[in-house]
């Protein structure tokens, strides 16, 4: 089974880190290698340009791919979006010179030139917004193009806005919000690799779900048990085990990590003790 991932760019390291968290690790660090075996038998990583992944997955060069949602839409590839990964988030924005006294794209009345690598997204955007513009397709860094006089504005990725400001630009409107996504060609469920792909997708979903989860173990006196249980949000319900000695119970539950301080304070106030908090690697549902 071939899994296409970015060979460089802003998504490469986050994708590799996520795969490592899932349990998929490349067995070679050779940056020149285009197809790399992994520790999962039968799964190979195919290193491709991020923007090429949707079209090549559609063509069957890989069964599954991880790329940006922006590139899926830009390519128009006939692929299935399988999982949104909740990382690699960014905005595709229309950016104009800081000197322009515009607060909205509706204020653009005269034709402008927009430089972008997102030609199809840009054409769709200006049509929907009614912006008089000519789209100039480029493949490199867009931020410098207005200062060179080759365009008036750009449509490009913005993470923080620092790079835009450095080049005398400001975001005027959001064209699209993007993130990393897992995609598959339309035939993956009927392929010989379907079972392997389904297992990998299950593990990915389990890793995503567990990313901000904590498991809590605590001992609770019998007389305090109901009060402690009432203070616990659980995925289903807390797991209870009677301790071998004494009138006490072991209580086990799973909570969101950002609620940990609040929950700890409540259970301690209600009589819990000997509390142990453990990170969760995966939750398979």
UniProtKB/Swiss-Prot annotation:
Location(s) in or outside the cell: Cytoplasm
GO biological process terms on file: L-histidine biosynthetic process
Keywords tagged on the record: Amino-acid biosynthesis, ATP-binding, Cytoplasm, Glycosyltransferase, Histidine biosynthesis, Magnesium, Metal-binding, Nucleotide-binding, Transferase
EC supergroup of this enzyme: transferase
Single GO MF descriptor: ATP phosphoribosyltransferase activity
Activity regulation, free text: Feedback inhibited by histidine.
Record field: catalytic activity: 1-(5-phospho-beta-D-ribosyl)-ATP + diphosphate = 5-phospho-alpha-D-ribose 1-diphosphate + ATP
Involved pathway(s): Amino-acid biosynthesis; L-histidine biosynthesis; L-histidine from 5-phospho-alpha-D-ribose 1-diphosphate: step 1/9
CC per GO annotation: cytoplasm
HAMAP family xrefs: HisG_Long (MF_00079)
Function comment: Catalyzes the condensation of ATP and 5-phosphoribose 1-diphosphate to form N'-(5'-phosphoribosyl)-ATP (PR-ATP). Has a crucial role in the pathway because the rate of histidine biosynthesis seems to be controlled primarily by regulation of HisG enzymatic activity.
Name of the protein: ATP phosphoribosyltransferase
Species annotation: Sulfolobus acidocaldarius (strain ATCC 33909 / DSM 639 / JCM 8929 / NBRC 15157 / NCIMB 11770)
């Amino acid at each position: 089974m071939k899994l296409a991932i970015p060979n460089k760019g802003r998504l490469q390291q986050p994708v590799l880190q996520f795969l490592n968290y899932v349990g998929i690790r490349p067995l070679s660090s050779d940056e020149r290698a285009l197809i790399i075996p992994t520790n999962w038998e039968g799964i190979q990583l195919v290193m491709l340009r991020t923007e090429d992944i949707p079209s090549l997955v559609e063509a069957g060069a890989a069964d599954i791919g991880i790329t940006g949602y922006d590139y899926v839409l830009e390519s128009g590839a006939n692929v299935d979006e399988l999982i949104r990964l909740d990382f690699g988030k960014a905005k595709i924005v229309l950016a104009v010179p800081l000197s322009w006294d515009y607060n909205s794209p509706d204020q653009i009345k005269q034709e402008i030139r927009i430089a972008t690598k997102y030609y199809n997204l840009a054409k769709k955007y200006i049509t929907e917004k009614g912006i008089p513009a000519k789209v100039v397709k480029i493949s490199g860094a867009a931020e410098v193009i207005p200062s060179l006089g080759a365009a008036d504005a750009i449509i490009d990725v913005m993470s923080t806005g620092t790079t835009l400001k450095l080049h005398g630009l400001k975001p005027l409107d959001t064209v699209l919000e993007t993130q990393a996504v897992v995609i598959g060609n339309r035939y993956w469920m009927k392929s010989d690799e379907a079972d392997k792909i389904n297992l990998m997708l299950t593990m990915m979903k389990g890793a995503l779900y567990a990313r901000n989860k904590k498991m809590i173990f605590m001992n609770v006196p019998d007389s305090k048990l109901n009060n402690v249980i009432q203070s616990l949000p659980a995925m289903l319900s807390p797991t209870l085990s009677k301790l071998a000695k004494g009138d006490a119970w072991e209580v086990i539950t799973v909570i969101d990590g950002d609620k940990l301080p609040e929950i700890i304070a409540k259970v301690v106030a209600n009589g819990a003790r000997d509390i142990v908090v453990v990170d969760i690697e995966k939750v398979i549902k």
